[in-house]
Amino acid sequence: VRLRIIDGGASTSFWMTFGGGDPVLVSADGLDVVPVEKNKTFIGIAETYDFIVTIPEEGKIEFRITAQDGSGTASAFLGNGNMLPAPIVPRPDKIGMMQKMAKMDMKMGAHALKYRPKKDERYKMKEEYGMQMDKMQGMNMDNSEKKDDAMPKMDHTKMQGMEMKKDSTQHDKMQDMNMDGMNMAMPKDTMKMETMAGMKLQGMDLFSEYNYDYLKSPQKTNYDKDVPVKEILLNLTGNMNRYIWSMNGVPLSEADKIKINNREVTRIIFNNLTMMHHPMHLHGHFFRVINENGDYSPLKHTVNVPPMQQVTIEFYGNEGDEYGDWFFHCHILYHMMGGMARVVSYDTPRDPRMYGYPVSNLVAETNKYYTWGMVDVASHTTALNVISSNIRNQFNVSFEYGWNKNLEAEATYEYYLHDYLRVFGGVNIENETRKSLDQFKTTAVVGVRYLTPYLFALDARIDNELRPRIGLGRSIMLFPRFSVFGYYEYQIDLGIVNNLPVNKDFTSETVWSAGAEYFLSRNISLMGSYDNRFGGGGGLSVRF
């Protein structure tokens, strides 16, 4: 029987395994490939694979899918009788993966939200983050999009320090090298760019089983060498803290269309600078996924880009029906909605059928405001925090009231300059006299907030009475359901606006608190804390 498997999930990719003999993989994304016996196969979101499965006269074959993170499995059975079990894919060794990563020379933290989104820093970003190729001094990074179909030049003497696995240095293995983005002068007959997708450097095999080298097209898929090539580098970037996803540090809402035309080959290099897989899908097209099969690289409509890896695709819009705008996105739903998408636009009039569906509506879907909050109800204090935010803009409202009638409330607006830094302004209200609600002081505040290394939340501000204040807070998850937190705040009044007490050069105020929280469920926690304004106590925290 022919079994077609489609990953229709929103956020989960799977490993597929079969009981009995190895099935024959015959199609990928609906297009034929050279048949190959393959049992354990990875399927990304939106991908499709067809297998020829031979059902025995006696016994039933288990077809088993395992979530990529090992969190769950499901099975279907083909045939009757005793079960022929499918191989079990073990859970990933997360500790082992982290140990391997610790040995790699790579810099994490590429911005998902750049300070200057219109500035082209693609190649600088690629060079700075991810796997550090310090010894590849001959790499030539051109900040313009390349339209040259010839192989650029590279000084071979600069590759003396490159560390490779021993078998990859042999001359007869050179066809497996992946030099995407490197400029290398080699005779065209000796090495074609399309055949260099398989090179693995020392320490880069952490995700080596995620590749498409087993897929080979039955016919040649390469394009005429005289057709010009436009090369586009897309660094895949993301921020798990705020869940912003983008390309080249620019989410869809701040990006220009990718302009292409049907008179040239469009070559897109995906460079994944995140620790998540990204199944990239281009509407309305099949593209070549460059692998070790060179001219016979397969055609697909979705390609999975593993963490810290690079994948190259090509397409040539010369069929006559490629025109207008096409959506191009990560098929993990939450990544797409977080901004990891683009609009690919041919230099043709827009499809008249789309006039009632402006692109701006699509873009707005990826830049919605989301609102959430938390209420603390405890024996010594009551607090409320509400946040409403889209990609760049955020509104905050906070309120604290203690059993001893100490009250403070604040409303601010902040703007994210990049992932970790934002500027803000707002209004702060607090009672002037402790243990009395008769009089309140209202001040205007401006400042910056910064998420420091090691995830400390820094707040530096000054109010309209020219009193500077600095605050620093941190929450640490010690166990799956248990966290501790702390906050320190110091404000000083130098008497620039206010009159100081006699014989005082300044006055100051210190606020600090510390506590712990146990998560009963996703939305409710037990908490206990001590605050130098309110004292100690305990209660419930409710998230909404």
Predicted regions and their residues:
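Repeated loop/turn-to-beta-strand initiation elements of outer-membrane beta-barrel proteins
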Residues: T382, I391-N396, D419-G425, T452-L458, ...
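Outer-membrane beta-barrel "beta-signal"
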Residues: V446, A514, R533-F544
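Edge beta-strand plus adjacent loop/short-helix module at the start
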Residues: V1, I6-D7, P87-M276, F286
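Transmembrane beta-barrel strands of outer-membrane/channel proteins
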Residues: V375-S379, V397-Y401, G425-I429, A460-N464, ...
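Residue-level signature of outer-membrane beta-barrel architecture
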Residues: V377, S388-N390, Y413-Y415, V448-Y450, ...
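Histidine- and aromatic-rich segments of cupredoxin/plastocyanin-like copper-binding domains
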Residues: V1-K124, N293-N304
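Transmembrane beta-strand segments of Gram-negative outer membrane beta-barrel proteins
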Residues: L234, V363-T382, S388-F399, L494, ...
